[in-house]
Amino acid sequence: MAREYKIEDYRNFGIMAHIDAGKTTTTERILYYTGKSHKIGEVHDGAATMDWMEQEQERGITITSAATTTYWKGRDGKTRRFNIIDTPGHVDFTIEVERSLRVLDGAIALLDANAGVEPQTETVWRQAEKYNVPRMIFCNKMDKTGADFYRSVEMIKTRLGATAVVMQLPIGAETEFKGVIDLIEMNALIWRDESLGAQWDVVEIPEDMKAKAEEYREKLIETVVEIDEAATEAYLEGNLPDNDQIRALVRRGTIDVKFHPMFCGTAFKNKGVQPLLDAVVDYLPSPLDIPAIKGIDFKTDAEIERHADDSEPLSMLAFKIMNDPFVGSLTFARIYSGKLEKGASVMNTVKDKRERVGRMLQMHSNSREDIEEAFAGDIVALAGLKETTTGDTLCDPLKPVILERMEFPEPVIQIAIEPKTKGDQEKMGLALNRLAAEDPSFRVKTDQESGQTIIAGMGELHLDIIVDRMRREFKVEATVGAPQVAYRETITRLTEKDYTHKKQSGGTGQFARVKIVFEPNPEGDDFKFESKIVGGSVPKEYIPGVQKGIESVLSSGPLAGFPMLGVKATLIDGAFHDVDSSVLAFEIASRACFREAAREAGAQLLEPMMKVEVVTPEDYVGDVIGDLNSRRGQIQGQEARGIAVVINANVPLANMFKYVDNLRSMSQGRAQYTMTFDHYAPVPSNVAQEIQAKYSGQK
């Protein structure tokens, strides 16, 4: 089977947004106008095609990034293939956003025209910057009360530090919003309400908007010519670029992430979606426009590149594992190079295991189509893989490569969980392990002493949904304990310790002496080990044992048994015995050495501090600030946003449980908040004593 669409006609993109910016609705409209969805699904009634897990339909928020393939005929009459990844906007699911951004070539950032740049918009924007994803901006909900396109443009500059290139101006706003001005063609598009947005009239720019349109077209040209020397010179000499040249410059600047073309409309009222789809074709990159993916040669460790080309060796990245009720476990993968056939044997280089591709599916939200072959640039769902987890590389066994791994955040909250009936214990273990394979920001462990199962994740909502999915998908009812904070411990001062481990009980004994300097790691939260042994007082082959011994103690700190952060250990001296010394003896010595040193080095308890942003009507500002202060919060500042006030604070996670209920009652349901992990900070001594008393009894 030959490739149906050329790779330059592919657009792999996602839609990223704040929780209520209208992402699912916009995706729905795209599916509707591209002919894949015959009935428009509204999130309000829980029937959107992309939101296909039951909890998403109930909560009206998108949780899993479903991948959808659809097609669009551009302005030139040529059909392009769109692979759309739907990304979640709720902060507890930022891991999903990271995963999707990793495999996208471009993105549409949605803004709510009333709120502009919201906290979660900043979070997903920063994640997109990390992966250097070209972005366009769609200012949605122009029909909403308080919609302000020009304020949103300004906020992109002040909040995100980015340059928005305005491509359209809105005609009217709020209930009067009826169309847009196209600043390249310099005409107006007015939608016909009765045709569900399928038809619009191209008319002259309204008289009262001509001057503004001229002003913004000039700004547009000034910004885009800056990226090209010849275009700048021509412009300075009074030669303006023609429309095709403007489009070419906008495309280049977007792909190089110099600026972001900005459009507007209202997906819910079906206005502005088709020009946005034309813009995806015109300005977002094809797989050929982005740099070749880099990887490490599996055998030699040399850096290699894989280009988006069917004739190159197969390389792909697994970016999502999902349980499908009909097919079982599905692995979503992006093919970067080469082609893949159903039934093929592929190499998982991260696990060093071979896998066989059973079925290969093209996904449309929650319906599927079996395919025999897939090519570079495709996003496919594979059934039958046993070993592969998120972030693994799959490739040609004869040309193995490891593509760069994704980074996953550490969980900040944990709860104990147990099945309601003893008979469900095994079923629960299976369900939790299956869910952990799907979601690397979710962890499962057994508490060694109490034997309890502990689950950890990115927030209360994250863990709520895990428990909910266990009930729905695996039919396991579970009881959960109170949420517990993922505290950490560290040391605060330098200490030097000399320790000798000696054991003699007939036959071979054990002997190891170590002298180690322990101090806070100036480079961050990781553990750092150095050896400054000269003259062989500790033979080279025993030094890994010294490091391993210290690392084994780091998982349980001296104060309350929490994992330790930010420790640096330097081995400066030691002694060994020709017969009695071994790697194990040095491991035991360094372990005991660190245990003794940790308290002397000023052990300190750390707690996760959350960045909290509360948006509240002015009437409740005093109450909100007073309440945050009572939670040991540090107010970082406040600013007006329209008629509301935005309060920024750093608050310990321990004091934020059930905050949503308090905030609702305090503001009569009118205030909202978002919370993201910010950093670990020392716990005040009075609170630390309580925590130690509580946990040392348990450990």
From Swiss-Prot:
Family: Belongs to the TRAFAC class translation factor GTPase superfamily. Classic translation factor GTPase family. EF-G/EF-2 subfamily.
Family annotation (PROSITE patterns): G_TR_1, G_TR_2
Pfam family, one: EF-G_D2
Ranges annotated as spanning the membrane: none
Classification via PANTHER family: RIBOSOME-RELEASING FACTOR 2, MITOCHONDRIAL, TRANSLATION ELONGATION FACTOR G-RELATED
Keywords annotated in UniProt: Cytoplasm, Elongation factor, GTP-binding, Nucleotide-binding, Protein biosynthesis
Protein name, as recorded: Elongation factor G
Biological source species: Rhizobium rhizogenes (strain K84 / ATCC BAA-868) (Agrobacterium radiobacter)
Annotated ranges, domain tr-type G: 8-288
Function description: Catalyzes the GTP-dependent ribosomal translocation step during translation elongation. During this step, the ribosome changes from the pre-translocational (PRE) to the post-translocational (POST) state as the newly formed A-site-bound peptidyl-tRNA and P-site-bound deacylated tRNA move to the P and E sites, respectively. Catalyzes the coordinated movement of the two tRNA molecules, the mRNA and conformational changes in the ribosome.
Protein location: Cytoplasm
Sites where the protein binds GTP: 17-24, 86-90, 140-143
Highest taxon of the lineage: Bacteria
Keyword GTP-binding part of the UniProt annotation: yes
GO BP, sorted A to Z: ribosome disassembly
InterPro entries per UniProt: EF-G-like_DII, EFG_II, EFG_III, EFG_III/V, EFG_IV, EFG_V, EFG_V-like, G_TR_CS
GO molecular function: GTP binding; GTPase activity; translation elongation factor activity
The UniProt record lists the keyword GTP-binding: yes
Matches recorded under HAMAP family: EF_G_EF_2_B (MF_00054_B)
Alphabetized SMART domains for the sequence: EFG_C, EFG_IV
Major localization class: cytoplasm
Cellular-component GO terms for this entry: cytoplasm
